C-alpha cells in the first residue's frame, strides 16, 4: 500500500502507547524500526501517521486496555501486568474480555511479587492468612489468593505501595519488581512471584475486516521480523566439508547451516543465524574446529 493512499478515518490503524513512562521510548523505537513515522499534534496526544495510515495515541498505560475494548484503538503496547489486571477485573465483574495478547515484545520485563518486611521469618504461604496486603493489582492478587485458598485482606492503593507496611496500613505488599532496589530501600524482601510481565502488543479478539486488516497483517509481520531477531547475528565463515558436523555441534542455538555457491577456493562458504551471544571465546572455538574467515554481522530486520 502506498504511503500516499488516502483512507477514510475508520480505515486508519490506531495504536495506543504509554504517553510517559518506562515503556514509552522502547515502544516508539520498535514502531519506528517497523517503518512508521508520524506528525505530532499540538496537544502531543495524537500522532498522525505519515509513512503509512497508522496513527499513534499517547495515553496513560492503564487507559490502553479500555481503549482497545471500546474499539477506539486497534492495538496497544502495554505491560502484561496492566492488561491482565483489567482482564481479571472484567471477569470478576461478569464482563467479557474483548482483547488479547498478540505478541510478547521482550522489553519492560518485571515481576509481580509478594514482599514482606525484612524482619519477617518467611516460611510458606500459610503465613498470609488474615494478613493485609497492599497492592495496585487487586484483581490479579484476588485470583491468586482464591487459587491458593488463602483468606487475606486486599488493601487497594494507586501508588506508593511499598511504604504501606511502614505506615501501618498493610502487613505486606504485592507490587512490581524490576531490580529489587526499591524493595531494599523500604526494608522489604520478595518472597513469592505472582506473575512475570513484559511489554506486549494487545489487540481486539475480533480483528477488523476492512482496510485495517491488511495494515495489521503487515505490521505484525514487521514486528515479528524485529522481535524474533533480538540478540541474533548472522555468522559467516569458510570450512571444508569434513568439518561441518563438528561446527554444527558447536552451534546449538543456530539455524541450520546454509551453504553458499562454491567460489572455487576449495572450501565451502557457510552462513547461519545465531540466536545467542557470539563471544570471542565462541569464535576461537569455531576456528579451532575448522572455521576460517569468521564474520559476525548484526541483523536489524528480516521477513521470514
Swiss-Prot record:
How's its activity regulated?
A: Feedback inhibited by histidine.
Q: Where is this protein localized, as stated in its record?
A: Cytoplasm
A GO molecular function assigned to this protein is: ATP binding
Q: Which domain of life is it from?
A: Bacteria
Q: Enumerate the InterPro entries for this protein.
A: ATP-PRT_HisG_long (IPR020621), ATP_PRibTrfase_cat (IPR013820), ATP_PRibTrfase_CS (IPR018198), ATP_PRibTrfase_HisG (IPR001348), HisG_C (IPR013115), N-reg_PII/ATP_PRibTrfase_C (IPR015867)
Keyword terms, alphabetized: Amino-acid biosynthesis, ATP-binding, Cytoplasm, Glycosyltransferase, Histidine biosynthesis, Magnesium, Metal-binding, Nucleotide-binding, Transferase
Is-annotated flag, keyword DNA-binding? no
Any one of the GO BP annotations: L-histidine biosynthetic process
Q: Could you say which residues form the signal peptide?
A: none
What cofactor does its activity depend on? Mg(2+)
Protein's UniProt keywords contain Disulfide bond = no
* Pathway the protein takes part in: Amino-acid biosynthesis; L-histidine biosynthesis; L-histidine from 5-phospho-alpha-D-ribose 1-diphosphate: step 1/9
* Catalysed reactions, semicolon-separated: 1-(5-phospho-beta-D-ribosyl)-ATP + diphosphate = 5-phospho-alpha-D-ribose 1-diphosphate + ATP
GO CC annotations, alphabetized: cytoplasm
Task: Give the EC number(s) under which this enzyme is classified.
Answer: 2.4.2.17
Database matches in HAMAP family: HisG_Long
What family name appears in the similarity comment? Belongs to the ATP phosphoribosyltransferase family. Long subfamily.
**Job of this protein:** Catalyzes the condensation of ATP and 5-phosphoribose 1-diphosphate to form N'-(5'-phosphoribosyl)-ATP (PR-ATP). Has a crucial role in the pathway because the rate of histidine biosynthesis seems to be controlled primarily by regulation of HisG enzymatic activity.
- Return the protein name: ATP phosphoribosyltransferase
The organism of origin for this protein: Xylella fastidiosa (strain M12)
Amino acid at each position: 500500500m502506498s504511503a500516499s493512499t488516502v483512507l477514510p478515518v475508520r480505515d486508519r490503524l490506531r495504536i495506543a502507547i504509554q504517553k510517559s513512562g518506562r515503556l514509552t521510548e522502547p515502544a516508539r523505537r520498535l514502531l519506528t524500526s517497523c517503518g512508521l513515522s508520524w506528525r505530532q499534534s499540538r496537544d502531543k496526544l495524537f500522532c498522525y501517521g505519515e509513512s503509512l495510515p497508522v496513527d499513534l495515541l499517547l495515553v496513560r498505560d492503564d487507559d490502553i486496555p479500555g481503549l482497545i475494548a471500546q474499539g477506539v484503538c486497534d492495538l496497544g503496547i502495554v505491560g502484561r501486568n496492566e492488561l491482565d489486571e483489567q482482564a481479571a477485573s472484567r471477569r470478576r465483574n461478569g464482563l467479557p474480555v474483548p482483547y488479547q495478547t498478540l505478541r510478547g515484545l521482550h522489553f519492560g520485563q518485571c515481576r509481580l511479587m509478594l514482599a514482606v518486611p525484612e524482619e519477617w521469618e518467611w516460611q510458606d504461604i500459610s503465613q498470609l492468612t488474615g494478613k493485609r496486603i497492599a497492592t495496585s493489582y487487586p484483581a490479579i492478587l484476588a485470583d491468586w489468593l482464591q487459587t491458593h485458598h488463602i483468606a487475606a485482606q486486599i488493601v487497594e492503593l494507586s501508588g506508593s505501595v511499598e511504604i504501606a507496611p511502614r505506615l501501618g496500613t498493610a502487613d505486606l505488599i504485592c507490587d512490581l519488581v524490576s531490580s529489587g532496589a526499591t524493595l531494599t530501600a523500604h526494608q522489604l524482601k520478595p518472597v513469592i512471584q505472582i506473575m512475570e510481565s513484559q511489554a506486549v502488543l494487545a489487540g481486539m479478539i475480533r480483528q477488523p475486516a476492512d482496510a485495517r486488516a491488511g495494515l495489521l497483517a503487515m505490521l505484525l509481520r514487521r514486528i515479528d521480523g524485529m522481535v524474533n531477531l533480538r540478540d541474533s547475528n548472522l555468522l559467516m565463515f569458510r570450512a571444508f566439508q569434513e568439518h561441518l558436523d563438528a561446527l554444527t555441534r558447536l552451534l546449538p542455538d543456530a539455524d541450520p547451516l546454509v551453504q553458499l555457491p562454491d567460489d572455487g577456493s576449495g572450501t565451502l562458504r557457510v552462513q547461519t543465524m545465531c540466536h545467542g551471544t557470539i563471544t570471542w571465546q565462541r569464535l576461537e572455538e569455531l576456528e579451532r574446529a575448522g572455521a576460517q574467515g569468521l564474520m559476525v554481522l548484526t541483523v536489524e530486520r528480516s521477513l521470514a
